[in-house]
């Protein structure tokens, strides 16, 4: 293992164990619109795909490290297979998710923690697969922006808002209405994959992932 790989693993170890950071509080009011919600699915792939992303990871605004992410997805089966690698191709984590269940295929410490793998795959799912079920409400506003809201019985929710011209924003809130994840998507879109994505996590760990699409295919 090179010195660079060692530093990268140390940095990501902080990400794996960082806990208890303050969440961003923002109450969900929900869209007061109803109608066609098909536009909310246009920002996600509808067929099987494989993609490669350059990932810039930062914790609490500090040092940024570059990683590579390889993801294979099957929207119809709600399935994901992901690899997290160093720029040199050293595999840090390989995992899959199907029907909400996560399985670790390969991991080096400290990434062999089930909690870390589960959290990472939930982030991957938020980025690449549409929320489960049907939106509770949705519609299109006068300014052309579209909004959809998925609400769960426990009070948590996922909201998608935006347009192809202005970009999209995905917000996930917990049972208390605190924002735990925010995703920004900007085109162009290639088979439902945004060229530029940014995930901001606020709770329980604070970090940011900026993804740039390098390659996409079936």
Regions found by a protein language model. Name each.
Residues 45-105:
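N-terminal mature ectodomain segment of secretory-pathway/periplasmic proteins
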Residues 145-218:
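Gly/Pro-enriched, hydrophobic low-complexity segments
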Residues 16-37:
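Bacterial Sec signal peptide processing site at the extreme N-terminus
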Residues 103-132, 136:
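Acidic/charged, solvent-exposed loop-and-adjacent secondary-structure segments enriched in E/D, K/R, S/T
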Residues 84-88, 97-101, 106-110, 164, ...:
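A mature extracytoplasmic/lumenal domain signature
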Residues 91-96, 114-118, 180-183, 207-210:
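A short, polar/proline- and glycine-enriched secondary-structure boundary/capping micro-motif
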Residues 30-54, 148:
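Post-signal peptide N-terminal segment of mature Sec-exported envelope proteins
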Residues 1-21:
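Sec-dependent bacterial lipoprotein signal peptides
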């Amino acid at each position: 293992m090179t010195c660079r790989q060692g530093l990268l693993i140390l940095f990501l170890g902080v990400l794996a164990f960082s806990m208890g950071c303050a969440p961003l509080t923002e109450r969900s009011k929900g869209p007061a619109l109803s109608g066609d919600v098909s536009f909310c699915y246009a920002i996600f792939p509808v067929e099987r795909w494989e993609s490669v992303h350059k990932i810039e990871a930062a914790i609490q605004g500090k040092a940024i490290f570059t990683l590579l992410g390889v993801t294979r997805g099957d929207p119809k089966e709600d399935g994901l297979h992901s690899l997290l690698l160093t720029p040199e191709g050293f595999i840090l984590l390989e995992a899959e998710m199907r029907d909400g269940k996560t399985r670790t295929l390969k991991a080096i410490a400290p990434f062999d923690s089930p909690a870390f793998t589960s959290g990472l795959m939930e982030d991957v799912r938020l980025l690449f697969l549409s929320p489960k079920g049907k939106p509770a409400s949705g519609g299109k506003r006068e300014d052309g922006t579209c909004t959809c809201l998925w609400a769960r019985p426990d009070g948590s929710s996922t909201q998608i808002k935006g347009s192809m011209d202005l970009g999209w924003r995905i917000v996930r809130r917990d049972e208390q209405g605190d924002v735990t994840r925010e995703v920004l998507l900007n085109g162009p879109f290639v088979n439902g994959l945004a060229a530029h994505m940014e995930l901001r996590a606020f709770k329980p760990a604070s970090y940011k992932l900026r993804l740039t699409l390098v390659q996409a295919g079936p």
